[in-house]
Amino acid sequence: MKKLGLLLFPLLAITLMLGGNAFAQDNSTYFTTYYSNANTSGAPDATLRIINDGNTDANLYADIYVFDDSQELQACCGCVISADGLLSESVNKNLTADPITGIKPQRGVIKVISSQSSDPTVISQFPGLREWSTHVQKLTSGYAMTETLAADSNLAPSEADLLSMLCSFDELLSGHPCTCTQEDQDF
């Protein structure tokens, strides 16, 4: 019995050490959120806010991919954010103003990759961005706004390849990417 305990103790210690490393890894490079009631008469505009946490003391890029509610890419762009900087993007004016289909979407999904590359067709994940967004909620009379932290998501290689490919097609077909506001300024 004592031999079994001596054998299991090192295995348990190794498991805990390796498991601790897995928990310490930073997977905050891919974020997802939604938008609703965009480009809707009488509804307020929603905002996507992204900060560079300054941990790397370097510029990072928010590679942004905007989908409609039919899961079709409508726009993509790469926006620079300096260390400790803030990027504020209007859903109506920056992200859905010039969609590839020509029809401004009212709801859909926004995906953001924290990247070292300004080109959203080149996936170069690098942690350091954080994202929040406001959401326009329809009420019986009028609209209400809520704000949430974007979901910290897992970016599979197949999803990264798909985003890169779709954005390449968007650039080839429309030539009109979403636009970036100047950092630390609202639209």
List each language-model region with its residue ranges.
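Bacterial N-terminal signal peptides that target proteins for export
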Residues: 1-9
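Short, intrinsically disordered low-complexity segments
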Residues: 1-2, 15, 110, 129
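Bacterial N-terminal signal peptides
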Residues: 9-17
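Gly/Pro-rich, tryptophan- and cysteine-flecked surface segments typical
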Residues: 22-187
